[in-house]
Every structure is written in C-alpha cells, then in structure tokens.
C-alpha cells in the first residue's frame, strides 16, 4: 500500500504484468493509476485502492466470477499483447514439463505425485494453439476482491500465461464448485457439458492441485500443501 500526502491510498506493486492497463480497461482488474521504472530497472505500478475485502471460498459461486473469466478468456487484444511481450503459448506437455523443472525435489520424489504426473502425461488433453487464451494462472479465492459496491475484480497477475482457458476454469471447479453444480456453471460460462469437456476438467483440475501444492510448499506453508495433496487424492 502507498499513501499520497493528502491521505489517498493506492495499491503499489513491483514488477507486475505490463498489461494491467488493458486489464483495467476491460474491468477485469482495478484501474492502473501510474507506472514508472526505477533506477535499478524494477517497474513500480500503482492501482486504484478499493474499499472491500478478499473473497472467501463460499463466495466463489458468484456469477460475476464466471463473467470476469469469460471476458478475460475471450479477449484477443490481451492475447496479442502478451505475444508482443514474448509470452509463448503453452500446451499441456509444456505445463507438466515446467512443473517438473520447478517443483521442489521433495515433491518430484513424492510417490503419489509421481503417479499423478505420469498419469497426466499418458492422458494429455487435446490442445489447439490457435484458440489458446490468456489465463490468470492462479484463480484462488484470495486473488479476487469484492468492493463495498459489490463489484468483483481479479488481482495478482504474476502467473498470467497463454494456454487453454480450462487452466482457470478447472481450478475454480475443482476447488470451489460442488460436482452437482458443474453443469450449470459450465452452461453459464458457455461450455457444452460433454465427455471432452469433463476429461479436460479432470486433467487441468489435477494439474491445478499440483501447482497449488508447489506454491504452498515453496512458501513453507505445509498445512495448506498437505491439504491440497489430500484434496487431490479425493478428486
């Protein structure tokens, strides 16, 4: 947080995605007020300070979230911006390879997680690069904020990437939406409820557990890392 001399507050962040202005223009993220490069090369940005709160797990069934993800995933302009910034389109194999490259040794050697990764490699879902979209990459409830006026925004864009939109969709469904409500959620988003879609949900859902396990492990939050492993076993 930063504060102006007149007492106004702003949300200040270092080295976040350069597309914040475009995200704000599409009302996906809070308004970008300014950005400047510091002497050491870091980029500092300031966003509008929002009076509100972080969403809880129980808030994640809001239709606003589906609308936000839909607007994000349908934006060709944002895809083109990321391509101009040298982001690369990632297919399912790329995602798994990156996880294996970056996951802690203890996770890579975990027998259960090894089995999950091997199974995901054997059942790579269909992927077409020409319809890859921008995805947030970490659509946890703690990365959504709701203002006092009831508007929801998506924040913390450090994990943004270009891949299948199911990357975000499956994280929401696997972590927050009861199975019985999946058909209604998918219909509102615009997906057909068929075997191909369900197979993708289960693939990307399992992968979302892997990414969350790795994030929590890296931050030494073993309670939540173990919780994700437990939920992955049940998924």
Regions found by a protein language model. Give the residues of each.
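An alpha-helical support segment within catalytic cores of ATP-dependent transferases
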Residues: 77-137
């Amino acid at each position: 947080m930063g504060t102006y001399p007149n007492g106004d507050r702003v949300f200040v962040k270092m080295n976040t995605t350069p597309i914040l202005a475009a995200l704000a223009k599409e009302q996906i993220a809070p308004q970008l007020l300014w950005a400047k490069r510091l002497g050491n090369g870091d980029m500092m940005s300031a966003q509008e300070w929002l009076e509100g709160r972080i969403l809880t797990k129980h808030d994640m069934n809001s239709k606003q979230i589906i609308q936000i993800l839909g607007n994000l995933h349908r934006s060709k302009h944002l895809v083109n911006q990321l391509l101009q910034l040298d982001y690369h389109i990632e297919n399912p194999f790329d995602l798994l390879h990156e996880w294996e490259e970056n996951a802690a040794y203890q996770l890579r050697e975990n027998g259960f997680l090894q089995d999950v990764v091997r199974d995901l490699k054997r059942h790579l879902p269909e992927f077409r690069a020409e319809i890859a979209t921008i995805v947030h990459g970490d659509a946890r409830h703690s990365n959504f904020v709701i203002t006092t006026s009831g508007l929801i925004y998506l924040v913390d864009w450090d994990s943004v990437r270009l891949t299948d939109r199911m990357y975000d969709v499956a994280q929401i469904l696997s972590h927050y939406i009861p199975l019985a409500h999946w058909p209604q959620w998918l219909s509102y988003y615009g997906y057909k409820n068929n075997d191909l879609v369900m197979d993708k949900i289960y693939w990307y859902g399992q992968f979302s557990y892997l990414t969350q396990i790795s994030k929590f492990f890296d931050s030494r939050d073993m309670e939540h890392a173990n919780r994700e492993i437990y939920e992955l076993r049940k998924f």
